[in-house]
């Protein structure tokens, strides 16, 4: 166990000026970060079910990549008993456990040096549709993770969650208008200004804008639940063939965009379709275990934004969510076809979905820089 309650060195330049860029998720990784789930108004039984699931995710990742977990001081003893022994527990305070969105975006240069981008955070919408209040501890998470690795820090003047962007490492950034252009994120910035900041801090050249993400995704349609890069020139899209399903027009509109765009290198995209599980709904029993608080209520009968696209690429592994016995095997087979060199590891992940996200949302990779 280590303590990371000290800020990282802050830089006054921008990554693009210094020759740094965000690498793709398939680049070599030295670590993956997670955060302990405990929030009783989001996780049933004060996180007990989620904690057991997070332990399984950490174990699956740990076979390929070292895992760090940020844990508030009050929960360290409990985390030591629940988490696999290979997980490095680091004392970090947080309001909730979405490492993808509160953790840093680590950028690298040609020499393999790593630095971190610390984005602004307002709990997915602040006082205009955000998911809880306060979020002051979450705002400090990225700097503490960077301190643990000794990486210098860029502070970006943009409210942005890691789950709202995907890059191919070759100049292309994919995102959704539903999230990045939402009035509850950066209301004073135009699309062009947001693109300019992403060019500065990710060092990308080309943008692929999908209009919307997954139906009922409370993050306002994060790209990481909807579509991701598999490798340069290839994407994986969340899909349903059911034209009566509310997801269909969203996925169809995304497919139309993807079929008619090119990436930063001028390539047309190869598009893989990953089937939608379910539809899945929160049960009465599942909603009962969540207490009332400042978080969004978890209601029985509510449709869950389940998606197999919400997986993590970590070195030679793909860690993906098992969500529906009717489609889990199909998703695993499809992922193995897309990633023939990777080990495909499924983890039962309904408990993460009940809290509003999935495996990609609760993890944040630290590239090796190699």
From Swiss-Prot:
Gene3D superfamilies: L-arginine/glycine Amidinotransferase, Chain A. It comes from the Bacteria. Keywords: Hydrolase. GO terms for biological process: putrescine biosynthetic process. It catalyses: agmatine + H2O = N-carbamoylputrescine + NH4(+). Coiled coil: none annotated. Its EC number is 3.5.3.12. One of its GO terms (molecular function) is protein-arginine deiminase activity. The active site is at 361 (amidino-cysteine intermediate). InterPro entries: Agmatine_deiminase (IPR017754), Peptidyl-Arg-deiminase_porph (IPR007466). NCBIfam families: agmatine_aguA, PRK13551.1. Belongs to the agmatine deiminase family. HAMAP family: Agmatine_deimin. This is Putative agmatine deiminase. It comes from Shewanella sp. (strain ANA-3). The lineage of its organism: Bacteria, Pseudomonadati, Pseudomonadota, Gammaproteobacteria, Alteromonadales. The gene is aguA.
